[in-house]
């Protein structure tokens, strides 16, 4: 086979892999609609659930793309979301100030991400160790605050009337769209995104060209922190209360969602900012479909198994694009 034929085959495979996440999203949406209607449930109710869960996951995952592009990961983002929301609620209950609550949420979210980046980048502690430690510490502190102030079951809350004007599709779409467009611009049209892709693809070569690894790692974690802050605020808008289990699964769901969106698990030049958006809603759709199809008594375990199978299949398919003798184009 000549070089031109190899190149054509490579490009066809690349195009197919790029469009697969969108096809999967449309297919999952159709399956959800058919399943809900066949069981006689209200479609508008399920679509609202999918939308509210998907927006939070997509927002946090969009910020996390910057970390995953470096070939790194952060499984403490769910705990950071819980911790930020907890301190935000405590701030409002102490001051009755919505503006101060929002400020605290974002300050805590970015601060937690900065702490993770400093431990990983400056002190050279492995990212896995850092994020696991942060996840455990933040979850424990948040749980202690919630238990002390509101009880283990009841949790802590803010008045629902405070955020009810914001609990609508238009506001949430606007938040997601603005944040995604900002991240899209930074990721695809500035040197920050280009250099982070370079670092994820070949860190040794990137360092030899003079790119500062620590600088761009810190920027990545800051962007993830902003996403966590938005996710915590949107969570409080949808459910104006916080319990010890709030946002508990977001950390791992982000990893699955980004891969579902077609982004390689190793990051690098094939990273795409739309992966968080497409993958986030795809994962939520799949999760709700499985809840509808599987008996509730065993649903959670089976759902996790099916999600894991989907995850491995997507990783395998996206990995096909890199098993060639050609450099990424």
Tell where the protein language model's regions lie, with residue ranges.
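Hydrophobic alpha-helical segments embedded in the membrane of multi-pass proteins
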Residues: 53-63, 79-83, 110-114, 181, ...
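Helix-loop-helix "hairpin" substructures at the membrane interface of multi-pass membrane proteins
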Residues: 97, 101-102, 112, 116, ...
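Alpha-helical transmembrane segments within multi-pass membrane transporters and channels
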Residues: 95-136, 178, 278-279
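Transmembrane alpha-helical segments in multi-pass inner-membrane proteins
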Residues: 242-305
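Transmembrane helix-bundle core of multi-pass membrane transporters
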Residues: 123, 127-189, 218, 239-244, ...
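Cytosolic-side transmembrane-helix boundaries in multi-pass membrane proteins
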Residues: 1-31, 181, 201-215, 286-329
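Inter-helical junctions in multi-pass inner-membrane proteins, predominant
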Residues: 38-49, 187, 227-258, 270
């Amino acid at each position: 086979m000549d070089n031109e034929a190899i190149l054509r085959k490579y490009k066809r495979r690349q195009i197919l892999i790029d469009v697969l996440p969108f096809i999967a999203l449309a297919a999952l949406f159709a399956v959800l609609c058919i399943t809900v209607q066949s069981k006689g449930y209200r479609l508008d109710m399920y679509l609202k659930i999918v939308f509210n869960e998907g927006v939070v996951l997509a927002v946090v995952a969009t910020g996390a793309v910057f970390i995953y592009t470096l070939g790194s990961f952060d499984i403490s983002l769910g705990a950071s979301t819980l911790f930020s929301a907890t301190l935000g609620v405590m701030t409002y209950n102490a001051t009755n100030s919505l503006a101060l609550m929002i400020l605290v949420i974002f300050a805590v979210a970015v601060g937690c991400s900065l702490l993770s980046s400093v431990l990983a980048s400056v002190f050279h502690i492995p990212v896995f160790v850092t994020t696991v430690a942060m996840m455990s510490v933040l979850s424990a502190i948040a749980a202690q605050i919630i238990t002390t102030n509101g009880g283990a079951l009841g949790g802590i809350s803010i008045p629902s009337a405070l955020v009810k004007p914001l609990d609508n599709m238009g506001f949430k779409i606007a938040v997601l769209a603005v944040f995604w467009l900002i991240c899209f611009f930074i990721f695809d049209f500035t040197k920050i995104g280009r250099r982070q892709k370079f670092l994820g693809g070949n860190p040794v070569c990137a360092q030899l060209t003079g790119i500062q690894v620590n600088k761009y790692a810190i920027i990545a974690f800051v962007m993830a922190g902003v996403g966590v802050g938005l996710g915590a605020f949107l969570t409080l808008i949808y459910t104006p209360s916080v319990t010890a289990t709030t946002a508990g699964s977001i950390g791992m769901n982000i990893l699955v969602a980004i891969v579902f969106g077609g982004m390689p698990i190793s990051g690098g030049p094939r990273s795409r900012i739309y992966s968080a958006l497409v993958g986030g809603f795809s994962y939520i759709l799949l999760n709700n479909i499985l809840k509808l199809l599987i008996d509730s008594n065993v649903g959670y375990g089976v759902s996790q198994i099916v999600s894991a199978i989907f995850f491995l299949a997507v990783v395998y398919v996206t990995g096909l694009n890199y098993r060639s003798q050609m450099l990424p184009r």
